[in-house]
A protein has these predicted regions:
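Catalytic loop of short-chain dehydrogenase/reductase
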Residues: 23-32, 103-133, 138-141, 145-190, ...
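Short C-terminal tail/terminal secondary-structure segment
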Residues: 241, 252-267
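Conserved SDR Rossmann-fold cofactor-binding beta-strand/turn motif
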Residues: 194-204, 244, 257-259
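Short, small/polar-rich loop/turn modules that mediate ligand/substrate recognition or access, typified
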Residues: 189, 194, 251-253
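A glycine/serine/threonine-rich, flexible loop-to-helix segment
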Residues: 59, 169, 190, 202-225, ...
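Short-chain dehydrogenase/reductase
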Residues: 2-121, 210
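A conserved structural motif in NAD(P)-dependent oxidoreductases
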Residues: 225-236, 247
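A short hydrophobic alpha-helix cap/turn motif
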Residues: 39, 93, 145-146, 186-191, ...
Length: 267
């Protein structure tokens, strides 16, 4: 199925729904691909950015979507998180989907031996990459309840399940993120709030540039996946669209791999 065919099949699927996107940094961001897919399906979106460096990019991209809301937010600051959700509530009157595509680790903690990870670096990676999902989900819950439920979707990677060279502290943070998905799904399920993760294969994004040897990872994956190719951001976006839609109403607590099947291989 081509991207155009997918858009045609999902047009209007999310009409009247609202979403909040954390993690757009560049036009190559997976979060932006997800936002584009949700918008094509009819969802009205709000975006956040952290700092002046990213504000221009987010405003330029989000400005191409009609009716979008753009707000500053540092996910390590509870007051800023509250301000974002208060504004989203005031503007949208509730929320249907939360996209969490936020991760960060110090560059020096993404190479060398994991045992040499600094205490500050470990805590920082956990706070931004894992705990933020809990903080955002908690803040989103009252807005979801106004709409009778909702969908939380986060992004993870195989490095949260297996040792991946030069992923180090981020792999540990992703492992915590994936377990958080399960606990949040159990907590929020009675409120009809679903929580799932997408484990995407390696994709050329701005964030990927910080991983040493990333081009080698791409080449290895292309050769060893069952589909003999790397995935595209649009394929991850289609999965997020599915999880945000009523089509996935019975799915929660899952980590869905979109990696051309690499995760099933034993080598």
């Amino acid at each position: 199925m081509t991207n155009e065919t997918t858009q045609s099949a999902t047009s209007g699927l999310l009409r009247g729904k609202t979403g909040l996107i954390f993690g757009v940094a560049h036009k190559t961001s997976i979060a932006w691909a997800i936002a584009s897919a949700l918008n094509e399906a009819g969802m009205r979106l709000a975006f956040t950015y952290q700092g002046e460096r990213l504000e221009e990019n987010v405003r330029e991209l989000a400005g191409t979507l009609e009716g979008s809301l753009i707000l500053p937010c540092d996910v390590t600051d509870d007051a800023q998180i509250k301000a974002v959700f208060d504004e989203v509530d005031a503007t949208f009157g509730g929320l249907d989907t939360l996209i969490h595509s936020v991760a960060f680790a110090k560059k020096e903690d993404l190479s060398g031996a994991f045992v040499d990870t600094s205490r500050d670096g470990y805590l920082l990676a956990q706070d931004i990459s894992a705990y933020s999902l809990t903080a955002l989900s908690r803040a989103a819950t009252p807005l979801f309840e106004k709409n009778g439920g909702g969908s939380v979707i986060t992004l993870t990677y195989l490095g949260g399940e297996r040792v991946v060279e030069n992923y180090n502290v981020m792999g540990v943070a992703k492992a915590a993120l994936e377990m958080s998905v399960r606990y949040l799904a159990a907590d929020l399920g009675p409120k009809n709030i679903r929580v799932n993760a997408i484990s995407a294969g390696p994709i050329k994004t701005l964030a990927a540039r910080g991983i040493s040897g990333f081009s080698n990872i791409l080449s290895y994956m292309e050769e060893h996946t069952p589909l003999k190719r790397n995935v595209e951001a649009a394929e991850v976006a289609d999965t997020a669209l599915f999880l945000a839609s009523p089509l996935a109403r019975g799915i929660t607590g899952e980590v869905i791999h979109v990696d051309s099947g690499f995760h099933i291989m034993g080598f």
